[in-house]
Amino acid sequence: LRPAVIVRTKAL
C-alpha cells in the first residue's frame, strides 16, 4: 500500500 493510504487508514 502507498504511504498516503496507510496514513489515511490510521486517521480513521
Curated annotation (Swiss-Prot):
UniProt note on tissues of expression: Expressed by the skin glands.
- The species this protein belongs to is Pithecopus hypochondrialis (Orange-legged leaf frog)
Q: What is this protein called?
A: Antimicrobial peptide 1
Superkingdom of origin organism:
Eukaryota
SS bond list: none
GO CC terms, sorted: extracellular region
For this protein's source organism, the top of the classification is: Eukaryota, Metazoa, Chordata, Craniata, Vertebrata
Tell me, what does this protein do in biology?
Has antimicrobial activity against the Gram-positive bacterium M.luteus.
Q: Which UniProt keywords apply?
A: Amphibian defense peptide, Antibiotic, Antimicrobial, Secreted
Report the subcellular localization: Secreted
- A biological process term (GO) from this entry: defense response to bacterium
